[in-house]
């Protein structure tokens, strides 16, 4: 199931007004509207659909209590940056990160590689960087 199919499924289940999208083809105006709607506690928007490549830098998503990754890339920095969009100054609640991983797929290999990168970075830095995946 591709991202657009997932967006359609969520929209169908919870209503179009509850979902915003933020990805490479999203215009600058639509991106700004998506963030504003998601961050507004009075808004009906409850689901922000994006990817680490486009949501990793320069945005705040502190209204998120749960972040779900349908897919990952091998770039650890982008993953950590995308996590930090929800967990930053202004966040008043804990944030849960969930990875959907189909067994015996490239996603499983990518998450394993990300875990290894975290382990290596922790050894080099002399501390635990993150406890996620």
Question: What are the roles of these predicted feature ranges?
Answer:
Residues 8-11, 15, 115:
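Class I S-adenosyl-L-methionine
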Residues 74-133:
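A conserved SF2-helicase RecA2
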Residues 23, 50, 62, 98, ...:
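Residue-level detector of conserved, well-ordered beta-strand and adjacent loop positions
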Residues 1-3:
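Short, small-residue-biased leader/transition segments that mark boundaries at the very start
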Residues 6-11, 32, 46-71, 75-94:
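SF2 helicase motor core recognition
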Residues 16-55:
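Conserved helicase ATPase core of P-loop NTP-dependent helicases/translocases
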Residues 23-25, 71, 101:
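Residues at the C-termini of beta-strands that transition into short coil/loop
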């Amino acid at each position: 199931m591709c991202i657009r199919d997932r967006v359609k499924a969520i929209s169908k289940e919870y209503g179009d007004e509850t979902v915003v999208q933020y990805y490479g083809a999203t215009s600058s105006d639509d991106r700004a509207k998506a963030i504003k709607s998601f961050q507004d506690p009075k808004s009906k928007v409850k689901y922000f659909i994006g990817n680490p490549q486009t949501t990793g830098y320069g945005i705040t998503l502190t209204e998120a209590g749960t972040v779900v990754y349908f897919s990952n890339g091998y770039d650890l920095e982008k993953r950590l940056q995308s996590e930090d969009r929800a967990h930053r100054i202004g966040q008043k609640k804990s944030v849960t990160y969930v990875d959907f991983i189909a067994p015996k797929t490239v996603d499983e290999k990518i998450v394993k590689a990300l875990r290894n990168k975290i382990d290596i970075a922790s050894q080099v830095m002399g501390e635990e960087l993150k406890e996620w995946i």
